[in-house]
């Protein structure tokens, strides 16, 4: 089968022989829906087959994957796959959360990487696309009581790096003040883990430059403009030396991007339109570089061309100042209220939809969720081809671009995937999550680590039922989105881990 884009260009075949789909051996970052489910959905939508580890060997929350099980999974499926998409965080540490802990020693990481290099060399004809993260600015928050140390570590990292650049005694004093708020053993482990992870990243760069890996995507997870991660990046950039096979950008949960990298054909095109501001010269929350740089690198990684004449539009909506409210730490009642900006942005989206453009909407007025004041004024959200607003800006971007590429190759729109983003990114993250957290705390539960996840999930479903029944004045600003989902089919929501940060949303066919 030969696929063609809208311009008629020949695209990579999705079938090796008649009736036999392209097979991708996929090792996700971890078991969360964004890393496990999203890539599988977008691969299967465009006719590919996703081969992934079975649940019984995979990580779950703080429990890392079974190394021997993962190794056996790769051995059993390497030959049948046409291309491999591998997360080094998963392979070498057992999950993203485990990559921030000392559960795996540096020597064990070296042994696992050496095994994989030898194993990969048994299949030199297989393209191998690799993803790995540069350790975030701070530690994991596995319970509410971790937040104090989390913020102190962020400040310690920020001011330490800034002081090394500016030489300012004031900056160094701030670093020392922050360090005094952190237990000594936590600081020692933090630096040990950073050293181990940086070693792995440097080694992955070397393997890519030697041609062992076909491409390497190094992702900077939650960060600031300054921090120990910046010093590590400077070393890595020097090692990379403009090698086109290696990309550094903000993000972490870029499974959809990695999945589509495996299948991307000759370049496809889209038109970038900034809504609410004239450009992307702002640093999104929890990122360390201008967002337009992350957009450019994501497009280059996938081979997407920015063509102003394209009828496919990547609409990036953000406020004029580029300042994002974090919907995780903000109560729903205090979400931003810029009525003029919301209406102007919605009017522009309405114009594009009325003119027949295929609009993929990246809603970045907020971080960790969409902005209902904006989306409620979109007259026909059912006409949107895609929507994304979850987590950080680069996470949301990767998800949207993954769907866009998959839709282009399939020649049809994955509206079920879009609706699941409405359920998750907008309805849950911008509204229900904060209410759920408030209720759980009132009953003595910690949203960061639930003691009774079954009860939390029951309350989650009840809140969605209230929303879809339009019970309460707060539900009215979601009426247009709820209508779209109701018209399409039934839905299901659940908590994949024992915390409320993410939800797993499904819309049934």
Regions found by a protein language model. Name each.
Residues 1:
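A small-molecule sensor/coupling module
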Residues 4-21:
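Short, Lys/Arg-enriched N-terminal segments with co-localized hydrophobic residues
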Residues 19-509:
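An N-terminal assembly and electron-transfer interface module characteristic of large anaerobic redox
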């Amino acid at each position: 089968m030969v696929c063609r884009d809208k311009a008629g260009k020949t695209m990579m075949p999705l079938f090796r022989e008649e009736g036999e789909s392209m097979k991708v051996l996929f090792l996700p970052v971890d078991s969360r829906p964004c890393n496990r489910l999203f890539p599988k959905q977008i691969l299967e939508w465009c006719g590919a087959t996703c081969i992934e580890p079975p649940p019984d060997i995979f990580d779950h929350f703080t429990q890392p994957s079974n190394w021997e099980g993962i190794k056996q999974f790769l051995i059993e499926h390497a030959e049948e796959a046409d291309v491999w998409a591998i997360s080094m965080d998963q392979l070498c540490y057992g999950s993203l959360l485990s990559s921030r802990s000392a559960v795996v020693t540096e020597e064990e990481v070296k042994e696992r990487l050496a095994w994989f290099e030898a194993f990969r060399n048994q299949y030199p004809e297989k393209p191998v696309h690799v993803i790995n993260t540069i350790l975030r600015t701070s530690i994991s928050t596995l319970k509410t009581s971790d937040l104090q140390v989390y913020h102190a570590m962020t400040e310690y990292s920020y001011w330490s790096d800034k002081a090394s650049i500016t030489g300012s005694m004031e900056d160094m004093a701030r670093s020392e003040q922050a360090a005094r708020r952190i237990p000594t053993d936590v600081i020692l482990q933090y630096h040990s883990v950073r050293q181990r992870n940086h070693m792995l990243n440097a080694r992955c760069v070397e393997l890519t430059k030697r041609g062992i890996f076909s491409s390497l995507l190094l992702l900077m997870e939650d960060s600031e403009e300054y921090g120990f991660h910046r010093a590590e990046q400077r070393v890595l950039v020097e090692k990379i030396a403009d090698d086109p096979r290696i990309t550094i950008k903000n993000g972490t949960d870029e499974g959809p991007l990695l999945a589509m990298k495996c299948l991307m054909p000759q370049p496809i095109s889209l038109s970038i339109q900034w809504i609410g501001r004239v450009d992307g010269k702002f640093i999104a929350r929890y990122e360390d570089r201008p967002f337009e740089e992350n957009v450019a690198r994501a497009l280059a990684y996938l081979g997407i061309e920015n063509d102003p004449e394209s009828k496919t539009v990547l609409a990036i909506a953000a406020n004029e100042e580029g300042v994002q409210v974090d919907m995780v730490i903000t109560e729903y009642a205090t979400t931003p209220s810029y009525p003029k900006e919301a209406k102007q942005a919605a009017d522009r989206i309405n114009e594009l939809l009325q003119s027949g453009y295929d609009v993929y909407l990246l809603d970045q007025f907020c971080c960790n969720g969409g902005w209902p004041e904006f989306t409620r004024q979109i007259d026909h959200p059912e006409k949107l081809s895609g929507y994304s607003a979850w987590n950080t800006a680069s996470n949301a971007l990767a998800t949207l671009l993954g769907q866009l590429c998959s839709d282009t190759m399939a020649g049809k729109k994955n509206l079920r995937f879009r609706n699941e983003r409405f359920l998750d990114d907008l309805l849950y993250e911008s509204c229900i999550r904060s209410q759920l957290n408030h209720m759980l705390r009132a009953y003595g539960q910690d949203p960061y680590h639930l003691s009774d996840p079954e009860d939390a999930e029951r309350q989650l479903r009840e809140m969605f039922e209230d929303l879809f029944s339009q019970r309460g004045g707060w539900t009215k600003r979601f009426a247009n989105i709820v209508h779209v989902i109701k018209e399409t089919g039934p839905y299901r929501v659940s908590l994949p881990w024992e915390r409320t940060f993410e939800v797993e949303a499904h819309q049934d066919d």
